[in-house]
Amino acid sequence: PLAVGGSGVFDLPLAFAGYGITAPKQEYDDYEPLGKRVASKAVLVLRQEPQKDNPHSVFNGNQATQHAALVRKIANASEHEAGAVVFCNDASATEPDALMDFRRAGGGENGRSMPVLQVSRSVVTDVIKQATGSSVAALEAEIDRTLEPQSQLLDGWRLRGEVTIQRQQTDAENI
C-alpha cells in the first residue's frame, strides 16, 4: 500500500484506467470509456502520462504536467467514485517491477478512505494479458500512438485484500 490511501477490507471488480487522467484542455480522458461503470471498482493506473517521451505531446512535450502527479491521479479516481487505486510503472520505468516508497504520494493528510496500492509491472502484464488478450505494453503503445484511451473493465478479475495503515499524530513546536 501507499500511505496516502485508507485502511480497510476490500473485494472489488478490476478495471484498467490507462494513465488515470482526465484532461479537458488536452481532450483526453481515461475514464470516459468506463463511464459510470468505474464506480466502486479498483482501477489499475499507469504512472506518468501519455506520450511522455514525445517533445510534441499535448501533455507539455516531454515535461511532466500536473496530470502525471500521483496525488492528482488518486483525486481523479476518487472523483470518478473508484473504490481503490492500484499503480503500476509505465513502460519508461528503468526498473519496471520496482515499487515506490510507502510515503511517495504523501502521508495521507487528505483523509482518503479508499486503498491506494501498487503492484509490479509483471503482475499487471499477466492480468491484462489474461483479461484482454492484449499486453499492457500494447495498450500503452496504442494510447501513445493515437492519444485515445484504452480503458476497459477486466471481466472476471477482482482485487481482494485488507490494508491497515496506522496514523499517529505528533505534537511539535514551531520554532
Q: What label would you give each PLM region?
A:
Residues 17-20, 46-49, 87-91, 119-122:
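Active-site-proximal beta-strand/loop segments in catalytic clefts of secreted hydrolases
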Residues 79-89, 96, 104-173:
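Long, well-ordered, tryptophan-enriched scaffold segments
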Residues 52, 93-94:
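Active-site environment of divalent metal-dependent phosphoester hydrolases
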Residues 70, 175:
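Alpha-helical metal-binding/catalytic segments enriched in His/Glu/Asp
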Residues 66:
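Acidic, glycine/polar-enriched metal-coordinating patches/loops
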Residues 56-63:
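Proteins synthesized as precursors that undergo proteolytic processing into mature forms
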Residues 4-5, 31-38, 72-83, 100-108:
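Mature extracellular/periplasmic domains of secretome proteins
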Residues 1-56, 154, 164, 169-174:
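Noncatalytic luminal/extracellular "stalk/propeptide" segments of secretory-pathway proteins
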